[in-house]
């Protein structure tokens, strides 16, 4: 069964949020996935200033794992690590999560570029994740 | 001539087989139906059907004479209520030409009216009263000025506040647009989309020195200065604190796009503001 890891990376390459679908990934594997995501940040940075699109599609591959990326106007990076290639589902997932992220951002009690601790946000992302993956 | 507020007129219209009594007081109608299912709806209650997405007075459910720059009437005909009667709101005793139910006092064919009721209700955006916002803005600046030890500290606070608002607001506005790798595209976005959202008008002039990274934005009728009055005998007519927040807005918006900049401004004549954006290399 293929797993999906979704990460939100801040402006200074600091992690803001992380989730896995389904939640059965072993600890050891989690570190490997974080390492892969970290390695792809430079590639995202290169693509951002070349492309006009927020959705950057698949930007990197590591063994079987593919990395899709989405960058908001404020240069917050959404990364999705996946094995199956389903671009429509991934794009729709990113768009819906972007909408959720905006709602969090417009909350005056949320400090910009700080980790997202909202349980409501977490629950909604899980719901969107199960809908598409 | 009698005062319109002292003599409320009551008009009765037959809508889809039901009699609807409409009280029009001073040109603002509150629909009242004698059918059991239809609730009494005041103009302000209609806002439950709409969504907020801007910072201006246009289309606000509050009557026009309480607004600044408001020139459109709120047409609520065709909205179906539980009792089946269409609600209608008149503003300043002028009936909109697009109004399907026509003048309240006139009888219209039942067939035509029933067609009107079957049309889907198109939601109009609920917007903020510009006068309310401006009063709030003046009070906010007054509060910050009083709580600060000197003018420089107050300006820093306003700049920081504007930065936060601009940073978040521009993220929301650029939801459906592409990224801006080019500096000029980002500035154009601020001049058109961003300025229109905040002030309901685009920037009047944009001059660029692209190589030097300098952009000069001119607003000849800066909305937040237009309604300020000065004591004619006063020697000091400095009102820079009312513009500092906007400089912060621009700085926050540019920062969100990934361009660090310094924003300065100059107030010319009564309400002409010139903002200078200098990109930090």
Swiss-Prot record, chain A:
Known partners and oligomeric status: Part of the multisubunit TRAPP (transport protein particle) complex.
CDD domains linked to this entry: TRAPPC2_sedlin (cd14825)
Cross-referenced PANTHER family: TRAFFICKING PROTEIN PARTICLE COMPLEX SUBUNIT 2 (PTHR12403)
Role this protein plays: May play a role in vesicular transport from endoplasmic reticulum to Golgi.
Entry keyword Plastid: no
Chief place of localization: cytoplasm
Domain of life: Eukaryota
Family per record: Belongs to the TRAPP small subunits family. Sedlin subfamily.
Keyword terms, alphabetized: Cytoplasm, Endoplasmic reticulum, ER-Golgi transport, Golgi apparatus, Transport
Keyword Cytoplasm attributed: yes
Protein name, as recorded: Trafficking protein particle complex subunit 2
InterPro entries to which the protein is assigned, alphabetical: Longin-like_dom_sf, Sedlin
GO cellular component terms attached to this protein's record: cytoplasm; endoplasmic reticulum; Golgi apparatus; nucleus; perinuclear region of cytoplasm; TRAPP complex
GO annotation, biological process: endoplasmic reticulum to Golgi vesicle-mediated transport
């Amino acid at each position: 069964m293929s797993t999906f890891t979704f990460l939100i990376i801040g402006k200074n390459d600091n992690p803001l949020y992380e989730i896995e679908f389904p939640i059965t990934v072993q600890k050891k594997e989690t570190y490997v996935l974080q390492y892969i995501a970290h390695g792809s940040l430079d590639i995202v940075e290169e693509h951002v200033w070349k492309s006009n699109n927020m959705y950057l599609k698949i930007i990197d591959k590591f063994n079987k794992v593919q990395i899709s990326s989405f960058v908001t106007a404020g240069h917050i990076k959404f990364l999705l690590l996946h094995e199956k290639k389903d671009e429509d589902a991934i794009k729709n997932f990113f768009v819906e999560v972007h909408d959720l992220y905006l709602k969090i951002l417009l909350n005056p009690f949320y400090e910009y570029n700080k980790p997202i601790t909202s349980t409501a946000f977490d629950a909604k992302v899980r719901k969107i994740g199960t809908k598409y993956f | 001539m009698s005062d319109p507020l002292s003599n409320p007129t009551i008009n009765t219209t037959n809508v889809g087989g039901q009699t609807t009594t409409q009280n029009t007081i001073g040109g603002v109608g509150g629909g009242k139906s004698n059918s059991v299912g239809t609730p009494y709806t005041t103009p302000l209650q209609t806002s439950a059907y709409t969504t907020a997405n801007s910072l201006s007075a246009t289309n606000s459910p509050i009557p026009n004479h309480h607004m600044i720059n408001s020139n459109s009437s709120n047409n609520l005909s065709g909205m179906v209520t539980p009792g089946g009667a269409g609600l209608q709101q008149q503003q300043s005793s002028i009936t909109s030409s697009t109004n399907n139910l026509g003048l309240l006092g006139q009888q219209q064919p039942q067939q035509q009216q029933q067609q009107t009721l079957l049309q889907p209700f198109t939601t109009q955006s609920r917007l903020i009263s510009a006068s309310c916002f401006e009063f709030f803005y003046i009070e906010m600046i007054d509060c910050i000025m009083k709580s600060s030890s000197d003018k420089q500290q107050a300006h820093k606070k306003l700049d920081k506040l504007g930065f936060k608002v601009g940073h978040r607001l521009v993220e929301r506005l650029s939801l459906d647009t592409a990224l801006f790798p080019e500096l000029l595209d980002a500035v154009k976005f601020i001049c058109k989309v961003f300025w229109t959202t905040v002030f309901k008008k685009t920037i009047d002039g944009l001059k660029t020195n692209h190589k030097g990274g300098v952009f000069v934005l001119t607003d000849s009728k800066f909305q937040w200065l237009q309604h300020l009055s000065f004591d004619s005998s006063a020697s000091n007519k400095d009102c820079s604190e009312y513009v500092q927040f906007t400089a912060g807005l621009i700085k926050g918006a540019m920062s969100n796009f990934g361009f660090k900049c310094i924003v300065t401004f100059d107030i010319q004549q009564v309400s002409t503001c010139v903002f200078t954006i200098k990109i930090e290399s």
